[in-house]
């Protein structure tokens, strides 16, 4: 599907973007390990999260939807059933990596595959430490790429240094640690998103966190988990697109409701404010052990270029392409480094952003681990290749709103991965 986005005069209104993708994934995966029933409200129904739901049903977990609420009957730590067929992970790296941790400690054989994009994404970063726990994982390129096979085995706890500060790696090892003998400790230089730790703590896991110069989390194996109730807040990664639009378009103001503001996730909003964005957190509260706010954003004509460093990346890794797009409208240079992780997302997001910006006439320099964007620049318009990557499609759709001649997005239907209603919601705030 191609989508043409034209210049608009302003956006206004209130919006509750879809629920958080990370928490929605974990609400299925982690509660399936519980001894008892869990209730999940406001579960995100999008491509990736529906993949998780379908995979866990195939593993024998009862997941029933009643009036928009999910009821998940946990099967305990090792009550999963051997799947009758290969598990299709679609486009979801989160589903794949966390499920590898879970399957490694079961008592059966399983096989996993995914779509063209997912089969090129690195799985060795999870498979290798799982193997050091005793997991039997094999597959393409010495077990580093899907398809992968997993033969469940007895696991032993390890100490692992998560040098990339990857939440998916950390979560996979913590899940495997639940199934292992002894303790598993994961240390990372900068804290990555911590929803897994928060949820496991709420479920009664024996989990301990240390915060010194680095961040460590230790979990003990074999303790029963309790079912819980989860009300999933709105996704800050989805809200970020509309916040960017409000900041860039004259006479705009927007209230984004019920947004997760966990400090491991709200880096985009903090950096946008540092650039000069008029952003305020209001009605701050707690929901399912997570901080939530309504975010007020309005047009901000005096944006300045900033520096994004390696330590900034974990809290905004999915929003860096969007921040790069905003940076085209900021005075001076915006320099992004330490973001090499973007090269192994749904697309090579550094390459995707740089090539598309250049094709639109924007002055940008590609770095091995980031980019340098020169501002402030006029956006004439043109054609954008989304590389079938939802975040590239949505990010350049926002740039289209300030383009002189409009921007045509190729494969715009990729937004279904995380935000099926994206264009519908965009029309709503434009019509206001």
UniProtKB/Swiss-Prot annotation:
Pfam families to which the protein is assigned, alphabetical: EPSP_synthase (PF00275)
Subcellular location: Cytoplasm
Pathway membership, UniProt: Metabolic intermediate biosynthesis; chorismate biosynthesis; chorismate from D-erythrose 4-phosphate and phosphoenolpyruvate: step 6/7
EC number: 2.5.1.19
Protein residues bound to 3-phosphoshikimate: 21-22, 26, 166, 168, 318, 345
Reactions catalysed: 3-phosphoshikimate + phosphoenolpyruvate = 5-O-(1-carboxyvinyl)-3-phosphoshikimate + phosphate
Species this chain originates from: Persephonella marina (strain DSM 14350 / EX-H1)
Single annotated GO MF: 3-phosphoshikimate 1-carboxyvinyltransferase activity
One Gene Ontology term from the biological process aspect of the record: amino acid biosynthetic process
Listed SUPFAM superfamilies: EPT/RTPC-like
NCBIfam families found in the cross-reference section: aroA
Protein family: Belongs to the EPSP synthase family.
Function (record text): Catalyzes the transfer of the enolpyruvyl moiety of phosphoenolpyruvate (PEP) to the 5-hydroxyl of shikimate-3-phosphate (S3P) to produce enolpyruvyl shikimate-3-phosphate and inorganic phosphate.
Binding site for phosphoenolpyruvate: 21, 93, 121, 168, 349, 391
The protein's assembly and partners: Monomer.
Main location: cytoplasm
Record: active site: 318 (proton acceptor)
InterPro entries recorded: Enolpyruvate_Tfrase_dom (IPR001986), Enolpyruvate_Tfrase_sf (IPR036968), EPSP_synthase (IPR006264), EPSP_synthase_CS (IPR023193), RNA3'P_cycl/enolpyr_Trfase_a/b (IPR013792)
Keywords for this protein: Amino-acid biosynthesis, Aromatic amino acid biosynthesis, Cytoplasm, Transferase
Name under which the protein is recorded: 3-phosphoshikimate 1-carboxyvinyltransferase
The UniProt record lists the keyword Cytoplasm: yes
UniProt entry tagged with the keyword Transferase: yes
CC per GO annotation: cytoplasm
């Amino acid at each position: 599907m191609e989508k043409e986005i034209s210049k608009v005069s302003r956006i206004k209104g209130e919006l509750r973007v879809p629920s958080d993708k990370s928490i929605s994934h974990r609400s299925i995966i982690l509660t399936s390990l519980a001894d008892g029933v869990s209730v999940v409200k406001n579960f995100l129904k999008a491509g990736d999260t529906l993949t998780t739901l379908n995979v866990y049903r195939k593993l024998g977990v009862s997941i029933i939807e009643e009036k928009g609420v999910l009821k998940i009957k946990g099967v305990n730590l090792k009550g999963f059933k051997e799947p009758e067929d290969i598990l299709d992970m679609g486009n979801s790296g989160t589903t794949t990596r966390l499920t590898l941790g879970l399957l490694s400690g079961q008592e059966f054989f399983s096989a996993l595959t995914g779509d063209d994009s997912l089969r090129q994404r690195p799985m060795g970063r999870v498979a290798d430490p799982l193997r050091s726990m005793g997991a039997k994982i094999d597959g393409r390129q010495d077990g580093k790429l899907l398809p992968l096979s997993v033969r469940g085995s007895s696991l032993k706890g390890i100490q692992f240094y998560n040098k990339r500060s990857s939440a998916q790696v950390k979560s996979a090892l913590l899940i495997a640690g639940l199934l292992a003998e002894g303790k598993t400790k994961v240390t990372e230089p900068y804290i990555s998103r911590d929803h897994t730790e928060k949820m496991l703590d709420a479920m009664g896991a024996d989990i301990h966190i240390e915060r010194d110069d680095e961040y460590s989390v230790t979990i003990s194996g074999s303790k029963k988990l309790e079912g819980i109730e989860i009300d999933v807040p709105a996704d800050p990664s989805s809200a970020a697109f509309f916040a960017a639009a409000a900041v860039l378009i004259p006479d705009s103001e927007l209230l984004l409701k019920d947004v997760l503001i966990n400090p491991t996730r709200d880096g985009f909003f903090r950096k946008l404010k540092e650039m000069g964005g008029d952003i305020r957190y209001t009605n701050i509260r707690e929901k399912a052990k997570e901080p939530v706010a309504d975010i007020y954003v309005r047009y901000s004509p005096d944006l300045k270029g900033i520096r994004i460093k390696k330590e900034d990346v974990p809290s905004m890794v999915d929003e860096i392409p969007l921040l790069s797009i905003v940076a085209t409208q900021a005075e001076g240079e915006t320099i992004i480094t330490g973001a090499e992780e973007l090269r192994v997302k749904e697309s090579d997001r550094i390459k995707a952003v740089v090539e598309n910006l250049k094709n639109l006439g924007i002055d940008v320099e590609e770095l091995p681990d980031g980019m340098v964007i020169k501002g402030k620049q006029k956006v004439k318009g043109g054609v954008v290749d989304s590389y079938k990557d939802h975040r590239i499609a949505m990010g350049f759709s926002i740039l289209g709103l300030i383009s002189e001649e409009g921007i045509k997005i190729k494969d715009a239907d990729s937004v279904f991965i995380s935000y099926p209603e994206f264009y519908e919601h965009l029309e709503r705030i434009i019509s206001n």
